[in-house]
Curated annotation (Swiss-Prot):
GO cellular component: DNA-directed RNA polymerase complex
Self-association and partners: The RNAP catalytic core consists of 2 alpha, 1 beta, 1 beta' and 1 omega subunit. When a sigma factor is associated with the core the holoenzyme is formed, which can initiate transcription.
Gene coding for it: rpoC
UniProt-recorded Gene Ontology molecular function terms: DNA binding; DNA-directed RNA polymerase activity; magnesium ion binding; zinc ion binding
Family membership: Belongs to the RNA polymerase beta' chain family.
Protein name as it appears in the record: DNA-directed RNA polymerase subunit beta'
Database matches in Pfam families: RNA_pol_Rpb1_1 (PF04997), RNA_pol_Rpb1_2 (PF00623), RNA_pol_Rpb1_3 (PF04983), RNA_pol_Rpb1_4 (PF05000), RNA_pol_Rpb1_5 (PF04998)
Length: 1377
């Protein structure tokens, strides 16, 4: 027999009236429910036993037949079939409606589906359905038009005038007739022709109408089924009625809603029989329509039907919708039996794979197992007796429990489960008390602490579940974070402090300088108190004496034998690195052993250290006053400049904030220096921060330095800093300023948690069906990766980006020519080292972004699974892992929107350019002019530099072994020295011989320069490290004259485009261009020569401060006007979570930039409707128009040459523009870089492939640009694979394929547009999704995880994949062996 679960697809359609009647077991004719005396269902009522089945098992209503032997017999007295009472859960009834009624889902929801089919507006449709207007069905030979609406008077007039020669009616009957008369094929071809005529300007309505018509055609649904003649009644057990203690009844709201429908229906039937006046019948029909609407969707109506306690009744739609609806409450989230929860306490004595379960809890959880063992051991013979033994808690029960619990894993879960490590399996150990004991090292994965957190325990029951728990979920198998492959099980707090103390070195202690021949001697000396843990000693390791400390020896002695000697002071960072290295070299079993040893040692020596904090440990630097006085002097100078009118108010504010930030930073450095020297580095506060056990530099600064600048509630920074620290104590005003920040912090945290949770939910929804389904998709495309650099420092090395991926190309050594990496070979750590030694720093790798698997991704494109550092298994749910990896750190991201001027976090802005390395200036780009001994950049520019990695004087060289400009790698001979020794290169780079020096230099790098930068070096110069090569104003952007001449104002009119403000603080007059836009006025400054000819023109953006007068002589390099950075302060740089949200939802940013659509020459045109037209002429002379809001600060001038994708004005980039102008690959790179940037700033490491999985899902669809011979509709959005398949079919038949362009869809929209209607319906907008799916007759292939959970199947991933389900286990016969 086939099980009900053995189906592979599920389909949803509109039910026809015949279908509804075929489901039904009888008509519900009365609105009664239960007889109040007998408490039995009323005949023909909503709970009738004849229709829905008997309420008593194997017994009819009247009691004539009472026994299972009469099964299936229908009683001749009461007509009730003798069955099991459970049939009341599945038998349906129906109500025959006296007048047709429209289904609210199809007419009320926007866009109204019936309205689209008939081309009637929603409001008109409403007035027809609610019997307010007539609609002409057949105009006959009258002046009326088909589908014309008539009110009462017009209808009466037409009746008088034309008599019976036309037909018009109202209500659902009229709509039903119209729907029956529709010819879908004819309508479809008519609309397709209209679309071709309209071409580009297609309106959305046409597209929607066509889609709905096509859906009806394909699905086999008939449009008239949206109007109902018969109403299904759901089984009574699903809308139960129960008696409460007081004799009253509690009933489901649906019964009340059905009752209203039945009452009105019966009343209407009577009125029709009585031939009542039309107006009464019509009113009753309208009420019937309303009552059916309420039954289907009560919340969507204007006038909600309310129950007894004045609360809206819950209709069928409400039962599905939202968090409390059927999908999310009962199908996706269920409560589980065999589970318990309790408070957690730390269990330092546990092994990593163990957890402590309170004995009483374990007994309850494992009760069935204990009962079985009791019966097997013949202590008892039935379950009842076994239960009573367990309740008495006899000794035998505890013995049995001990045996049952051995090797039976339990799952521990801590809410919120943000990633998969929030549920792990442990072996239970029975403990006294009522609290669950948790191993201290797994706290990080759970984000647990012991301040009252609770955890839940679940018991896996079946052998398969236990096997999976052991093999996949055991805590010792989850040592790495799936987001990035770093260890997630590592010591923190006490353990770190203990080991830091143990491995530190202290001067002048017992036993300093002694030599020991082996570890045992060291331990003996420590035990005899003749050697201090922190003493510097010499000990023999592998036959050589090394300098170390006694504590290091103790640490290494305890480690497993294979690990090489660890000789450094261990901070938390060092410990994590150690764990990583040991994992890579020796595997997980050694790591697990090592972790438990580290835990024991850490706790032991933290106890021995016994550190305490006192006020004397908090040392305030004596120099503090000096720093503060210096800052006050600088601020006085800034104030003076402001009073003179040299700088604007915003610049003054920015400068003040900058001064305090710098002062605070300098003071903190001094303070840390003092703390480090205090007590030979054994200052407890410093030790805690330095070891990474607790506290940070920032917190110590507030204790012993100065609290610094605080932010207002608006996010602006209060320029009055808190100079005191907590040791000195705050003044009243300082305390009051502090309260702002504290309150904001708490409010942010609460909002952030909900926001991050919602982000995770949306990400899971879009990626839930991305599973590794095949081994190799065979693609030849990949993406380029290289180390991510910020100027000269490497932010993310190539290793992070490439390890674990597969190469697309064959890579040979540039020196020997041998193959280092072959096509489709995994890039391992060793391969990366090899590539680095030969100087290869760019790779093309396979990526999820370019994977061509039809569903999900393939093994080769995904690469390594970071949770175990092995190639990913087929069946791994990588989409969910990706969503969790991005969503889980979401709670750590800030909600705050940073201001450009906001420097509470940002530190001070520098006004100098100086590089950390020596370098050679290789070239300049950007418009610059020569002014007194330097170069002044009048627009943004770029420096091209090559860093000097190594240099040697030529006079010490006897013979060169390399040529100028030759590439060298590590270990290559460079020259022979005077002593005849060959000197080898210790770096990779290029040889440069210059100024009597032999240098090794890096590849060229670009450094961007701001407008107004003054450069003091020339191309070709060699510059030492740290030398200042240029200066600029960080708080203002100048507009600079590039020619000599006379100033002439154009369209700068006082009171219109120019505003003169008297600064009340300084009494100076400030001239500012207004940000109002005038059609005919375009404020600019012209520069004219002696002959009065215009030689330069500068457009002035809104809010620019003028620095020149009309008619004034001007020289090259003079500042004409400047834009204060403060005016940019209002343009928030959205950081943190809101930014990630915007990127994933592909929202168009507020302050938008305009990107050049093509490469070419810029031409300025006039301002029209508040927008400036800028044309870019491409190489063929074609003009491409760009409209930029007037008053925006332009980054180009008339006649400039731009590249496609260059920004023409300042602002934020729109991801959709990137896709349109630069294409899909650039968009992927842009989104990846922007999202990673937010996480990286918060110190969160997420591997690119996780974000790649989500971006891939956002770019799954394409938009049809040309239809060809396919069935697509112009502008329709379809799945890439559907598109390719249709085209393939059309090409095979010799037709013309369709053309489409890629589009980017935000995650919420993409989740709703997903192929699976079950998944989409359980996400958001449930009723809308189901409405559209039913019209289209959608089939859900049950490919994703969510739909299978809802249906109750095993999820198709991991061991639940069909691939693995079909595995048969056969015994080997002896002959084969």
């Amino acid at each position: 027999m086939k099980e009900i679960k053995d189906f592979e697809k599920i389909r949803i359609k509109i039910a026809s009236p015949d279908q509804i009647r075929s489901w039904s077991y009888g008509e519900v004719k009365k609105s009664e429910t239960i007889n109040y005396r007998t408490l039995r269902p009323e005949k023909d009522g909503l709970f009738c036993e004849r229709i829905f089945g008997t309420t008593k098992e194997w017994e009819c209503y009247c009691g004539k037949f009472k026994s299972i032997r009469y099964k299936g017999i229908i009683c001749d007295r009461c007509n009730v079939e003798v069955t099991h009472f459970k049939v009341r859960r599945e038998r349906m009834g129906h109500i025959e409606l006296s007048a047709p009624v429209a289904h609210i889902w199809y007419y009320k929801y926007i866009p109204s589906r019936i309205g689209l089919l008939l081309d009637i507006t929603a409001s008109n449709l409403n007035s027809i359905l609610y019997y307010e207007k007539y609609i002409v069905i057949e105009p006959g030979d009258t002046d009326l038009k088909k589908m014309q609406l008539l009110n009462e008077d017009e209808y009466s007039e037409a009746k008088e005038r034309y008599g019976m020669s036309f037909s018009a009616s109202m209500g659902a009957e009229a709509i039903k007739t119209l729907l029956e008369n529709l010819d879908l094929d004819e309508l479809s071809s008519k609309l397709r022709l209209q679309m071709i005529d309209k071409d580009d300007k297609t309106d959305k309505k046409l597209l929607r109408r066509l889609e709905i018509i096509e859906n009806f055609k394909v699905s086999g649904n008939k449009p008239e089924w949206m109007i109902m003649d018969v109403l299904p009644v759901i089984p009574p057990e699903i809308r139960p009625m129960v008696q409460l203690d007081g004799g009253r009844f509690a009933t489901s709201d649906l019964n009340d809603l059905y009752r209203r429908v039945i009452n009105r229906n019966n009343r209407l039937r009577k009125l029709l029989l009585l031939n009542a006046p039309e107006i009464i019948v019509r009113n009753e029909k309208r009420m019937l329509q309303e009552s059916v609407d309420s039954l289907f969707d009560n919340s969507h109506k204007r006038k909600v039907v309310k129950g007894t306690s004045n609360r809206p009744l819950k209709s069928l739609s409400d039962a599905l919708k939202g968090k409390q609806g059927r999908f999310r409450q009962n199908l996706l989230g269920k409560r589980v039996d065999y589970s318990g929860r309790s408070v957690i306490v730390v269990g330092p004595e546990l092994k990593l794979h163990q957890c402590g379960i309170p004995a009483k809890m374990a007994l309850e959880l494992f009760k069935p197992f204990v009962i079985r063992k009791l019966i097997e051991s013949e202590s008892v013979f039935n379950i009842k007796r076994a239960k009573s033994l367990i309740e008495q808690e006899v000794d035998e029960v505890w013995q049995i429990l001990d045996n049952v619990i051995k090797e039976h894993p339990v799952l521990l879960n801590r809410a919120p489960t943000l990633h998969r490590l929030g549920i792990q399996a442990f072996e239970p150990v029975l403990v006294e008390g009522k609290a669950i004991k948790l191993h201290p090292l797994v706290c990080h994965a759970y984000n647990a602490d012991f301040d009252g957190d609770q955890m839940a325990v679940h018991v896996p029951l079946t052998p398969a579940a236990q096997a999976e728990s052991w093999a996949l979920m055991l805590s010792t198998n989850n040592l790495l974070n799936p987001a990035n492959g770093h260890p997630i099980v590592f010591p923190s707090q006490d353990i770190v402090l203990g080991l830091y103390y143990l491995t530190m070195e202290r001067k002048n202690v017992v036993g300093e300088g002694r030599k020991f021949s082996n570890f045992n001697h060291v331990l003996l000396a420590i035990n005899n108190k003749s050697l201090d843990y922190n003493a510097r000693i010499y000990v023999k390791v592998d036959g050589e004496y090394i300098e170390t400390t006694a504590g290091c020896v103790v640490f290494n002695e305890a480690l497993p034998g294979k690990i090489s000697f660890v000789n450094k002071t261990l901070s938390d960072y060092e410990l994590q690195n150690l764990i990583s290295e040991v994992y890579v070299v020796y595997g997980s079993s050694i790591v697990i052993e090592m972790l438990d040893i580290i835990k024991e040692l850490g706790f032991k020596y933290a106890t021995k250290f016994g550190c305490t904090i006192s006020m004397s440990d908090i040392i305030v630097p004596e120099e503090k006053k000096v720093y503060v006085d210096k800052a006050n002097r600088e601020i006085a100078k800034i104030q003076n400049d402001y009073t003179k009118g040299v700088i604007t108010g915003e610049e003054r504010y920015n400068n003040v904030v900058s001064v305090w930030s710098k002062t605070n930073e300098e003071l903190t450095n001094k303070m840390m220096e003092i703390l480090k020297k205090d007590r030979d580095g054994f200052n407890v506060i410093y030790m805690m921060a330095d070891s990474g056990a607790r506290g940070s530099r920032n917190q110590i600064r507030q204790l012993a330095g100065m609290r610094g600048l605080m932010a207002k509630t608006s996010g602006d920074i209060i320029e009055l800093p808190i100079i005191s620290n907590f040791k000195e104590g705050l003044s009243v005003i300082e305390f009051f300023i502090s309260t702002n920040g504290a309150r904001k912090g708490l409010a942010d945290t609460a909002l952030k948690t909900a926001d991050a949770g919602y982000l995770t939910r949306r990400l899971v929804d879009i990626a839930q069906d991305v599973v590794v389904r095949i081994e190799d998709c065979g693609t030849i495309n990949g993406i380029k990766v290289e180390a991510l650099k910020n100027g000269e420092e490497i932010v993310e090395p190539l290793r992070e980006k490439a390890v674990g991926s597969y190469s697309i190309e064959r890579i040979k050594s540039p020196i020997t020519g041998e193959i280092i990496l072959d096509v489709n070979e995994e890039i391992t750590e060793d391969k990366i080292k090899l590539l680095e030694t030969v100087g290869i720093d760019k790779l093309v790798i396979r990526s999820v972004l370019t994977c061509e698997a039809e569903h999900g991704v393939c093994q080769k494109c995904y690469g390594r699974d970071f949770s175990n550092n092995k190639p990913v298994n087929i069946g791994e749910a990588v989409g969910i892992i990706a969503a969790q990896s991005i969503g889980q750190p979401g709670t750590q991201l800030t909600m705050r929107t940073f201001h450009i001027g906001g420097v509470a976090q940002a530190g001070s802005e520098d006004d100098k350019i100086a590089l950390k390395n020596s370098f050679i200036l290789n070239g300049l780009e950007g418009f610059n002019v020569q002014v007194d001994g330097g170069l002044l950049f009048t627009r943004k520019g770029t420096l091209r530099v090559i860093n000097v990695i190594y240099e040697e004087d030529i006079k010490d060289i006897k013979e060169f072994k390399v040529l100028d400009s030759q590439k060298v790698i590590k270990g290559m001979p460079l020259f022979t020295s005077k002593d005849g020794i060959d000197v080898l290169s210790s770096h990779i780079g290029y040889v440069r011989i210059k100024d009597n020096k032999l240098m090794i230099v890096s590849e060229e790098q670009e450094i961007s320069l701001k407008t107004g930068t003054k450069l003091e070096v020339n191309v070709g110069d060699y510059v030492e490290a740290g030398r200042v090569i240029g200066t600029f104003d960080p708080f203002a952007e100048p507009i600079i004259a590039e020619v000599r001449g006379k100033v002439k104002f154009k369209d700068i009119i006082l009171g219109t485009t120019l505003k003169e403000e008297i600064n009340l603080e300084t009494g100076n007059i400030e001239k500012r261009i207004t940000d109002q836009v005038f059609e005919s006025l375009d404020p600019r400054i012209l520069i004219i020569n002696d002959r009065g000819i215009e030689i330069a023109s500068y457009v002035l953006p809104g809010d620019a401060y003028l620095q020149v007068e009309d008619g004034q002589d001007i020289d090259i390099g003079d500042i004409i006007a400047k834009l204060s950075k403060g005016s940019e302060k209002t343009q928030d740089i959205t950081g943190g979570l809101p930014r990630v949200n915007d990127l994933f939802e592909t929202r168009i940013p507020k302050n938008l930039t305009e990107m050049a659509k093509v490469s070419g020459v810029v031409q300025f045109k006039a301002i029209q409707k508040g927008k400036r037209l800028i044309n870019v002429l491409d190489e063929y002379g074609v003009e491409h128009k760009h409209y930029i809001p007037a008053g925006k600060h332009l980054l180009v001038r008339d006649g400039d040459v731009v590249k496609a994708g260059d920004m023409l004005c300042d602002g934020r980039i729109n991801p959709h523009d990137v896709l349109e102008i630069l294409g899909g690959i650039s968009l992927q790179e842009f989104l990846l870089a922007e999202i990673q940037d937010v996480y990286r700033k918060q110190g969160v490491s997420i591997n690119d492939k996780h974000i790649g999985v989500i971006i891939k899902q956002m770019m799954k669809k394409v938009k049809i640009v040309s239809v060809g011979d396919t069935n697509f509709v112009y502008n329709q959005k379809v799945d890439k694979h559907t598109f390719y398949e249709q085209n393939k079919r059309v090409i095979e038949q010799g037709g013309e394929p369709a053309v489409a362009s890629p589009i980017l869809i935000g995650i919420t929209k993409a989740s709703l547009n997903i192929d699976s209607f079950i998944s989409a319906a359980s996400f958001q907008e449930t009723t809308k999704v189901l409405t559209d799916a039913s019209i289209a007759g959608s089939v859900d292939d049950l490919k994703g995880l969510k739909e299978n959970v809802v249906i109750g199947h095993l999820i198709p991933t991991g061991t639940g994949m069909n691939l693995y389900k079909r595995v048969k286990v056969r015994e080997n016969s002896s002959s084969e062996m």
